[in-house]
């Protein structure tokens, strides 16, 4: 038996130190030989007939079922290696005299219930280290003589020395990460900072980011960024609003043209409006020119060019029917008379009168009474009208200087 134990290798299915044979031929040989020898020695030592189909050992109180009733793993591993291990021990103090002839029959230290605890089919992914010594024998009660064979083995509880094969921690992190995504509207700084290095898929519905990166940023920064983009491009002045409104949405800058991507998707009328808006606005010509002298000279030259071109008459300017003509002249006149808000401008001076007044304003912002009377006679206006125009022009220049100064101050800061 010792040679047999040395020859057999440990089974990969049973994490024990006992040697088990995998082949059915070796199992049947071990079972038959040991049952016959055990029955004979038990009958001699105990003085009782050990025959029969079940194989009772009277001195030890152990019932040995036939080999055909034993499931796989109990034939050679569960019971009979213990017989060989008890060969050199002292005779067990059994009730019927004990198996004193060789100790082949299992005595009170019955080893039959051991397969319920040790030789169970453990999971293949989790292997247990073999213990150092054989497991201690368990006492067998006397009432198990009439019990049927042991039930099929139950799955074992996870052993502390088994290697971790499940991914419970990863699943926990994934669930917390999903909760972090769901609670995107009210994230906590610590949780967002802890979960930042994890990879991220497409953003959820609550996130309003246009193009999210592969790594999620902390929640406070992401919310502010999403809020800004949603305000700037989603609802502020997008292409859909340009298509829906009759007049294109005006950007904050003065000389800002709509991007070509938005202009390509707009209608023909919106395209014409964009072309008209890209030209220098003649509102400065009607009520006053730019802030500096160079700007005023440029506005004066543009006014002169418009005056030399075939401009519409005063009647066409006054009548809204001729302003809505489909020709380019009618559109220019309508753009010149119509403010960006859609209302008609109040322009009491003609282009020639405005040009002459702008020229005089370039030379001198404050007029004497004699010079004012001369200008009023040249442009066919009253003295009071010229005085009021110069007052309004000075106020407009002051306002434009203030706006230019604010724009220059804010241009030094890069908010991108």
Curated annotation (Swiss-Prot):
Predominant place of localization: nucleus
One GO molecular-function entry: histone deacetylase binding
Protein's cellular compartments: Nucleus
PROSITE patterns xref list: HOMEOBOX_1, HOMEOBOX_2
Biased composition (Pro residues): 131-140, 147-159
Residue ranges, compositional bias (Gly residues): 40-58, 93-108, 231-240
Summary of the tissues where the protein is detected: Expressed in the developing limb bud where it is restricted to the mesenchyme along the proximal-distal axis. Also found in developing gut and urogenital tract. In adult tissue, both forms found in kidney but only isoform 1 is expressed in skeletal muscle.
Region (Disordered), start-end ranges: 40-60, 81-167, 228-345
CDD domains in the record: homeodomain (cd00086)
Biological role stated in the UniProt entry: Sequence-specific transcription factor which is part of a developmental regulatory system that provides cells with specific positional identities on the anterior-posterior axis. Binds to the DNA sequence 5'-AA[AT]TTTTATTAC-3'.
Complexes and interactors: Interacts with SIRT2; the interaction is direct.
Similarity-based family: Belongs to the Abd-B homeobox family.
Protein name in the entry: Homeobox protein Hox-A10
Source organism: Mus musculus (Mouse)
Lineage, uppermost ranks: Eukaryota, Metazoa, Chordata, Craniata, Vertebrata
């Amino acid at each position: 038996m010792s040679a047999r134990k040395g020859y057999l290798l440990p089974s990969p299915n049973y994490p024990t130190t006992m040697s088990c044979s995998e082949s059915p031929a070796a199992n049947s040989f071990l079972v038959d030989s040991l049952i016959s020898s055990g029955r004979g020695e038990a009958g001699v030592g105990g003085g009782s007939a050990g025959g029969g189909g079940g194989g009772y050992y009277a001195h030890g109180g152990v019932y040995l079922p036939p080999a055909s009733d034993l499931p796989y793993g109990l034939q050679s591993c569960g019971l009979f290696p213990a017989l060989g291990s008890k060969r050199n021990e002292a005779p067990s103090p059994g009730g019927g005299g004990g198996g004193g002839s060789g100790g082949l029959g299992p005595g009170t230290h019955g080893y039959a219930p051991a397969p319920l605890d040790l030789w169970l089919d453990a999971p293949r992914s989790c292997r247990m280290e073999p213990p150092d010594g054989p497991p201690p024998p368990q006492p067998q009660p006397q009432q198990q003589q009439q019990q049927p064979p042991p039930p099929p083995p139950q799955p074992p509880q996870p052993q502390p020395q088994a290697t971790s094969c499940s991914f419970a921690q990863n699943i926990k992190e994934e669930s917390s990460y999903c909760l972090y995504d769901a609670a995107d509207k009210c994230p906590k700084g610590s949780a967002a900072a802890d979960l930042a290095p994890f990879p991220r898929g497409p953003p959820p519905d609550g996130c309003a980011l246009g193009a999210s990166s592969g790594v999620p940023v902390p929640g406070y920064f992401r919310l502010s960024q999403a809020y800004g983009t949603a305000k700037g491009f989603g609802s502020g002045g997008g292409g859909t609003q340009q298509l829906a409104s009759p007049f294109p949405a005006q950007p904050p800058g003065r000389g800002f043209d709509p991007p070509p991507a938005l202009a390509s998707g707009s209608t023909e009328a919106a395209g014409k409006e964009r072309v008209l808006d890209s030209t220098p606005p003649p509102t400065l010509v009607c009520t006053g020119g730019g802030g500096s002298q160079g700007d005023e000279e440029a506005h004066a030259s543009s006014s002169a060019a418009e005056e030399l071109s075939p401009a519409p008459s005063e009647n066409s300017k006054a009548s809204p029917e001729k302003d809505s003509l489909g020709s380019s002249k009618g559109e220019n006149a309508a753009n010149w008379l119509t403010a960006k808000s859609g209302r008609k401008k109040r322009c009491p001076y003609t282009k020639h009168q405005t040009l002459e007044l702008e020229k005089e304003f370039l030379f001198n912002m404050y007029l004497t009474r004699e010079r004012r009377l001369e200008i009023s006679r040249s442009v066919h206006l009253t003295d009071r009208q010229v005085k009021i125009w110069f007052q309004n022009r000075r106020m407009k220049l002051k306002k434009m200087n203030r706006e230019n100064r604010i724009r220059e101050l804010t241009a030094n800061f890069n908010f991108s």
